[in-house]
UniProtKB/Swiss-Prot annotation:
Swiss-Prot/TrEMBL cofactor(s): FAD
Family: Belongs to the DadA oxidoreductase family.
PANTHER family the UniProt entry points to: D-AMINO ACID DEHYDROGENASE (PTHR13847:SF280), SARCOSINE DEHYDROGENASE-RELATED (PTHR13847)
One term of GO molecular function: D-amino-acid dehydrogenase activity
Record-given protein name: D-amino acid dehydrogenase
HAMAP family on file: DadA
Keywords assigned by UniProt, alphabetized: FAD, Flavoprotein, Oxidoreductase
GO cellular component: a single term: plasma membrane
InterPro entries in UniProt: DadA (IPR023080), FAD-dep_OxRdtase (IPR006076), FAD/NAD-bd_sf (IPR036188)
Originating gene: dadA
Pathway per the UniProt entry: Amino-acid degradation; D-alanine degradation; NH(3) and pyruvate from D-alanine: step 1/1
Reaction(s) catalysed by this chain's protein: a D-alpha-amino acid + A + H2O = a 2-oxocarboxylate + AH2 + NH4(+)
């Protein structure tokens, strides 16, 4: 069938690839001149299924109050006066108890683990290049309390069958030799050896080229005005005087999905602003070997071939994309503290992006009350980690195939009572 995908970030392009491979005629529409030029452009670069976890966690409300008075706080809030922001924050607060946290983390890890398997299969099939590494992820703790709290997450990892190592500070250099110089500042770490890293933008643009060669059409420089609907069906995508029609439509506009779906489907996806630095490597033996997660500052430090990507922080400030110097200083402080010889920080490229975040941290993937409208959005800080799995899952659902993982709790249905997701394969002409 003919499928239109709205959005050419990593999630949209992955969706296009898997739908094309399933035999569908796919068109991708985006306002930008190319793929992966917004949120997917310079994210932290880690593919970390085991660390997939919601920001809505026990203790976060109290921490948020403390962070208001800290210079290098990982989370900041600025009220924008909108009812949507207040509602979203209230929903997030309601997910900050242990029960919700464990449930949300469990389904996030499930999708993220599946996504890594899909990426591995894609890499074996296509030999796609993206400066990828399979060196695992190491979460660093600066306090004894953080080290002790890791046992909560370990329970979820064990349930999901994710291998891990809980390391004392004296053993951190076994995983990342450059940390030997700063181990005295740390209390320990949690290593997940199966995690990966890679340049998300490079991956997305290379996958887009492969998809185009396979028959996917890309309509760039095409700002969408609205989705046209009639009854329980979408009948077109309007931009200017032109209307593109298809049999099915996939919303993958990231943070902009909510506004585009207004009056059609209500989804709680809010822009969570983040920042990154991309730094040329100075000394090879002083740079990280894979991905490091600083638990205190919620910042990731990732190794590419000849660059270090430092990314993180979260600002609930609406669609503000201003580059704030204090945020740059925080990123510089963390990377200099952990890898003082690693990179030419003064030559860094500073970037910001808006991650599409749901209040429970889990993305929205699946059907809607509209028979031919599908969602693949709301991946928050884990779009790169979850992209391939979300794309394959969406392709299976839209094509009428039984997905490889449970998916009901990933749909928009979880936000409303009495709503049952459409049966997979309900569209006439769906491929089997």
């Amino acid at each position: 069938m003919r499928v239109v995908i709205l959005g050419s970030g990593v999630v949209g392009v992955a969706s296009a690839w898997y739908l094309n491979q399933a035999g569908h005629e796919v068109t991708v529409i985006d306002r930008e001149p190319g793929a992966a030029l917004e949120t997917s452009a310079a994210n932290a670069g880690q593919i970390s299924p085991g660390y997939a976890a919601p920001w809505a966690a026990p203790g976060v409300p109290l921490k948020a109050i403390k962070w208001m008075f800290q210079r290098h706080a990982p989370l900041a809030v600025r009220l924008d006066g909108t009812q949507f922001q207040l509602k979203w924050m209230w929903q997030m607060l309601r997910n900050c108890d242990t029960s919700h946290y464990m449930e949300n983390k469990g389904r996030m890890v499930r999708l993220a683990e599946y996504s890594r398997d899909c990426l591995k299969a894609l890499r074996a099939e296509t030999n796609i290049q993206y400066e990828g590494r399979q060196g695992g992820t190491l979460q660093l703790f600066r306090t004894e309390q953080q080290y002790e709290n890791a046992t909560r997450d370990i329970a979820v990892l064990e349930d999901a069958g994710v291998p891990y190592q809980l390391l004392e500070s004296s053993r951190l250099a076994e995983v990342d030799p450059a940390l030997a110089e700063v181990a005295h500042k740390l209390t320990g770490g949690l290593q997940l050896p199966n995690d990966e890293t890679g340049d998300c933008q490079l991956f997305t643009q290379n996958l887009a080229r492969m998809a185009e060669q396979a028959g996917v059409k890309f309509r760039f420089n095409t700002p969408v005005d609205q989705l046209l609907c009639d009854g329980e069906q979408i009948y077109g995508v309007k931009f200017g005087d032109e209307v593109i029609k298809a049999d099915a439509y996939v919303m993958a506009f990231g943070s902009y999905s909510t506004a585009m779906l207004k009056g059609i489907v209500d989804i709680p996806v809010y822009p969570l602003k983040g920042y990154s630095l991309t730094i040329p490597i100075a000394q090879e033996d002083g740079a990280p070997v894979s991905t490091i997660l600083d638990e205190t500052y919620k910042i990731a430090i990732t190794r590419f071939d000849n660059r270090i990507r430092v990314g993180g922080m979260a600002e609930i400030v609406g669609f503000n994309t201003e580059l704030l110097q204090p945020r740059r200083e925080t990123l510089e402080m963390v990377v200099r503290d952990l890898y003082p010889r690693g990179g030419h920080v003064e030559q860094a490229t500073f970037w910001t992006g808006l991650r599409p975040m749901t209040p429970d941290g889990t993305p929205v993937v699946g059907s809607t009350r509209f028979k031919n409208l599908w969602l693949n959005t709301g991946h928050g800080t884990l779009g790169w980690t979850m992209a391939c799995g979300s794309g394959q899952l969406l392709s299976d659902l839209l094509s009428g195939r039984t997905p490889a993982i449970p998916y009901e709790d990933l749909s928009v249905a979880r936000y409303s009572r009495g709503f049952t997701p459409s049966r997979p394969g309900h569209l006439h002409g769906a491929h089997s």
